Amino acid sequence: MDIDPYKEFGATVELLSFLPSDFFPSVRDLLDTASALYREALESPEHCSPHHTALRQAILCWGELMTLATWVGNNLEDPASRDLVVNYVNTNMGLKIRQLLWFRISYLTFGRETVLEYLVSFGVWIRTPPAYRPPNAPILSTLPETTVVRRRDRGRSPRRRTPSPRRRRSQSPRRRRSQSRESQC
């Protein structure tokens, strides 16, 4: 069975695969971040959102995987086999959990549009030959400040991604990030 844990949220495994494995913080850092930002919602018996549920499940899966790894480490007597299991868990399962945790936390923190736009921007940047791309990769936290997306209204053009050169950009900070943090659920 080929299950894509990102599909219902508008992303895909392929879209996240453009981010290199060293891009994702450690599981411990991601767990600390999730706890600091969303502890109340994660521990609540109430259903908050599909992302909170998915984040809970990823955290629980990591805990179970660590329990299994500890059991294997304590009960597998052959050191070579033990090392193979530990390396497999850290390399493959660890990366998948880090990707899941990063995606869920980013989605809750920055919102769907910003995260998806970041994934597409990074994918385009990384596939562009170095001689033709800017030296620095896109940064997720700066996307809301550097892009302009307008809602579709009657009589307006569908989307404008960058301000026209004639218009000065407002110096007031954008509030998209703080709005997503206000409602924990």
UniProtKB/Swiss-Prot annotation:
Phosphorylated by host SRPK1, SRPK2, and maybe protein kinase C or GAPDH. Phosphorylation is critical for pregenomic RNA packaging. Protein kinase C phosphorylation is stimulated by HBx protein and may play a role in transport of the viral genome to the nucleus at the late step during the viral replication cycle. Its main location: virion. A motif (Bipartite nuclear localization signal) lies at residues 160-177. Keywords: Capsid protein, Cytoplasmic inwards viral transport, DNA-binding, Host cytoplasm, Host-virus interaction, Microtubular inwards viral transport, Phosphoprotein, Repeat, RNA-binding, T=4 icosahedral capsid protein, Viral penetration into host nucleus, Virion, Virus entry into host cell. Residues 136-185 are annotated as: Disordered. Residues 149-178 have a biased composition (Basic residues). Residues 157-179 are annotated as: 3 X 8 AA repeats of S-P-R-R-R-[PR]-S-Q. This is Capsid protein. It comes from Hepatitis B virus genotype A2 subtype adw2 (isolate Germany/991/1990) (HBV-A).
